[in-house]
């Protein structure tokens, strides 16, 4: 029997979502937990699949996975307690054997969290120009044979809790590094280094390329599919671990800034300037 899961994970702790030999990955830990629980005997038997791969450092809030197991009730009841604290399942649904997360997802959305304040209104102006069907090769790392045309259904920038911009974008599918490329262009615009209409230039030029923003700010935010999920029991340790990490990261940020003895925002801006000099007017 095949099961689909809504799941989340803390990307900073993994080399990526897909299995890589001798590296800690989301797939590797998920399959290891299933083997420990007795859901299947090995990775081949598990048939682990996702709605979209994520790179090293990229987190997920609601990602779509699937596995094959003859013990669906056991998986729903106990799998979370055999996973590490930085991976968790929110809900599960029984699906037919032809189900494939990649094709079942009608829409995927991402959020990118920027580290410092920028002009949100300029960024929103630029983000709105991404909506529609375009050739997004200028924002992506292209793979041979991949169609560069995608349809973005939603793109907006708003101010987060800390006053820093947050970029949210949705589409049926994305190219590799496409969202990070968009985020990179938007932060350049938000800092006033180029105008919002540079987006049209990137969409219309077959040779233009933008440097992607760092992976650590990116979250696979949500997936829309025609499934009804049964909620799964959660480990208290997951939220406790995330809260502990958040506190440690905040303290580490303040410590690093104190040791720097200069304005870290200025260093960040200089890095953006170096990476996006080709876009400046």
From Swiss-Prot:
The keyword Isomerase applies. The gene is truA. InterPro entries: PsdUridine_synth_cat_dom_sf (IPR020103), PsdUridine_synth_TruA (IPR001406), PsdUridine_synth_TruA_a/b_dom (IPR020097), PsdUridine_synth_TruA_C (IPR020095), TruA/RsuA/RluB/E/F_N (IPR020094). GO terms for biological process: tRNA pseudouridine synthesis. Pfam families: PseudoU_synth_1. It comes from Methanocorpusculum labreanum (strain ATCC 43576 / DSM 4855 / Z). Belongs to the tRNA pseudouridine synthase TruA family. It is an enzyme of class 5 (isomerase). GO terms for molecular function: RNA binding; tRNA pseudouridine(38-40) synthase activity. Formation of pseudouridine at positions 38, 39 and 40 in the anticodon stem and loop of transfer RNAs. Its EC number is 5.4.99.12. This is tRNA pseudouridine synthase A. The active site is at residue 55. Substrate binds at residue 110.
């Amino acid at each position: 029997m095949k099961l689909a899961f809504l799941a989340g994970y803390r990307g900073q702790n993994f080399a990526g979502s897909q299995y890589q030999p001798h590296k800690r990955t989301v797939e590797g830990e998920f399959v290891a937990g299933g083997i420990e629980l007795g859901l299947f005997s090995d990775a081949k038997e598990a048939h682990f699949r996702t709605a979209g791969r994520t790179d090293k450092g990229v987190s997920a809030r609601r990602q779509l996975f699937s596995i094959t197991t003859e013990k669906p009730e056991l998986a729903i009841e106990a799998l979370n307690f055999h996973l590490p604290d930085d991976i968790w399942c929110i809900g599960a649904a029984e699906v037919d054997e032809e189900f494939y997360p990649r094709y079942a997802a009608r829409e995927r959305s991402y959020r990118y969290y920027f580290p410092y304040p920028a002009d949100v209104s300029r960024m929103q102006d630029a983000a709105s120009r991404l909506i529609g069907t375009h050739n997004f090769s200028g924002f992506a790392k292209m793979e041979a044979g991949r169609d560069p045309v995608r349809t973005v259904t939603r793109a907006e920038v708003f101010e987060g809790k800390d006053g820093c911009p947050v970029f949210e974008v949705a589409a049926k599918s994305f190219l590799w590094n496409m969202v990070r490329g968009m985020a990179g262009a938007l932060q350049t615009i938000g800092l006033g280094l180029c105008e919002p209409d540079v987006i049209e230039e990137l969409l219309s030029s077959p040779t233009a390329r933008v440097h992607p923003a760092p992976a650590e700010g990116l979250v696979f935010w949500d997936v829309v599919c025609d499934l009804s999920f049964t909620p799964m029991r959660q480990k208290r340790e997951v939220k406790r671990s995330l809260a502990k990490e958040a506190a440690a990261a905040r303290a580490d940020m303040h410590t690093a800034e104190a040791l720097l003895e200069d304005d870290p925002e200025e260093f960040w801006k200089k890095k953006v300037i170096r990476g996006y000099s080709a876009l400046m007017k």
